[in-house]
């Protein structure tokens, strides 16, 4: 960890927290209808309600809200699945891509609807422009809106008392999309285009290369099978490449909401390491900022809405402390390189001529400082976009993003999902504190009783169950082990990372695992769907239960939930649950890998 790394991380955190304040103020006013923007575009909003047959004045119980949420997203899966299956017969397909397979289309549909954006295909070789714009980009907006409205419903549960409703799902989704996501994405898209991110609908361009490249390609027979000689070795033919095909597309418009909505699915296979998605250090900084700005602002929205800003600041402080620690560990691990290279007298020190450390799988235009920031931000949130190959991180460098996902992505987390996950841990923290002092636990004026704790237990235990059971099945099944490219502990880490990513709706991966198979398509689709909606439903149940409770006044025995003591208690609860749940699995994967480095060095 050098001065440059520290300075870049510090500047980023300061800019993020400073920007979160006005964004939170805007979000609060939009959702309560007091913003001037809502008044200006009110006729458009009301026209949408009339067209859809919705009465915006009618609010929903938590069960109605949950049913609307699940049904809306299930219809999104069906629409996107159908679009990917028939894209070959639709316009907007200059490359003539055919339909995706049944399991591939279903996996992709579930992935984008659940805000995971897990991609086991090469987008620029698989998905048409129409499917990208009408299918994937639309779901990038709607899945992000779903996460935000769920946390808004939970916040209303804390803010209201003796109420039977928590809002109107259709009104919430419309306002979040119309007044928050669309304008913010438009601004970010314009800034990205200024940096060189492309935005067009041209066919792919064939351009001559500056230098002819030659390589040995396998000779194929008439059926396309490799030809072998008498000894069974493949026959090769020398091939020269004088031209290159450059993929085009409407990238900037999708890139903006991909980052802002913590979606993460790339227009290209290289994701945000591709120069057409992320060409400059400034665009990289902007994309990291876009990932975390709404999650950070929502913490302050929580405080504003319940009438005690200190509560939101405390949650934001806990997240920021954890984020800073993760950035420090990640950057130090990558800047330190590996003992194996050090034992070979390779110079790993940073200097004006080199970044030093472990630069494998990283872009030289970003270096270790910005890469470390991106790795932590994308896995602390439920984004999953990458500007480097996570499979090439050091064992400790790979452990950090894996653990951030396994903690439930509550360190800022996805838009909405991060805050409602952290508030669930806050309920668990005050429950534990209540047990220690012998008092009924309270949080922001609401008693936390057995029903809330049952729902908290479901939220806390469901994703670890999906991760560990899914990993176990994949390790035991032949179809699961067949995808491992790197045997040993790293192969296990690849599978553990895949299910941690899917169940927690992140979408990033250790690329050495081949997952475009029916086995992994079905397994990860199940993990993604239940990881998303298996937690949303109990969160909405908590919201409904809290809204119906009376507000109680704080007394001398009430645990303060706005000071440093609560921040420490909250972080301790998050880390303890994660450590106890995943430590054995992490020891078998990244833990063993890290120890093997020192064995190799000697």
UniProtKB/Swiss-Prot annotation:
The system is composed of three essential subunits: KdpA, KdpB and KdpC. GO terms for cellular component: plasma membrane. InterPro entries: KdpA (IPR004623). Belongs to the KdpA family. PANTHER family: POTASSIUM-TRANSPORTING ATPASE A CHAIN (PTHR30607), POTASSIUM-TRANSPORTING ATPASE POTASSIUM-BINDING SUBUNIT (PTHR30607:SF2). The keyword Metal-binding does not apply. GO terms for molecular function: P-type potassium transmembrane transporter activity; potassium ion binding. The gene is kdpA. It comes from the Bacteria. It is found in: Cell inner membrane. Pfam families: KdpA. The chain crosses the membrane at residues 3-23, 64-84, 135-155, 178-198, 282-302, 313-333, 418-438, 456-476, 522-542, 565-585. It is a multi-pass membrane protein. This is Potassium-transporting ATPase potassium-binding subunit. Part of the high-affinity ATP-driven potassium transport (or Kdp) system, which catalyzes the hydrolysis of ATP coupled with the electrogenic transport of potassium into the cytoplasm. This subunit binds the periplasmic potassium ions and delivers the ions to the membrane domain of KdpB through an intramembrane tunnel. Keywords: Cell inner membrane, Cell membrane, Ion transport, Membrane, Potassium, Potassium transport, Transmembrane, Transmembrane helix, Transport.
